[in-house]
Design a protein with these regions (language model features):
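Compact, glycine-rich, soluble single-domain proteins
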Residues: 25-152
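Bacterial N-terminal signal peptides that target proteins for export
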Residues: 2-12
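C-terminal motif of bacterial Sec signal peptides marking the signal peptidase cleavage site
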Residues: 19-23
Length: 152
């Protein structure tokens, strides 16, 4: 009788660990953050607290399943080489704006993206970074194409 109880307890403990691990993965926990500075053409400095997505698995998930992204925060996608980046909004319920940034930190494009839209939003040239923020944040902060992200 004691042996069956121990086996049952071990089974339920293992099941609980599995369920917790599975549910934590879907929640898409926050990544490490860094305060980024954007120098505008007018001479202002604009700051954004950005999560850093620098691995394939973190870049793939991005802001998926996140219902609210506060103003002044974002996610910087870091790639190893320059390429024409394409993003979509699969499983992303929050409207976002994206800036495509070259290897020197110069913002080349800014686009708005609609929640759950599966259309590609492509950079117009080769870039190395993409910065996603709540939709309209770049405009509200006075950030424009040609401004420069101070790279780390």
């Amino acid at each position: 009788m004691v042996r069956k109880t121990k086996k049952a307890a071990a089974f339920f403990c293992a099941l609980a660990v599995f369920v917790c691990a599975a549910s934590c993965q879907k929640g898409n926990p926050k990544l490490p953050t860094k305060t980024l500075c954007i120098a505008t053409a007018s001479g202002a400095q604009v700051f954004v607290e950005a999560e850093i997505a620098d691995k394939p698995e973190t870049r793939e998930k991005g802001f998926m399943f996140r219902k609210k992204i506060p103003d002044g925060t974002g996610m910087l996608f870091v790639f190893e080489e320059d390429k024409v980046l394409r993003f979509w909004m699969k499983n992303t319920p929050s409207p976002l704006s994206i800036a495509y940034i070259d290897y020197k930190g110069v913002i080349k494009d800014i686009f708005d993206m609609k929640p759950f839209d599966l259309s590609d939003v492509s950079a117009t040239g080769y870039v190395r970074y993409a910065l996603e923020v709540p939709q309209g944040w770049f405009a509200r902060a006075g950030v424009k194409v040609g401004d420069k992200l101070e790279l780390f």
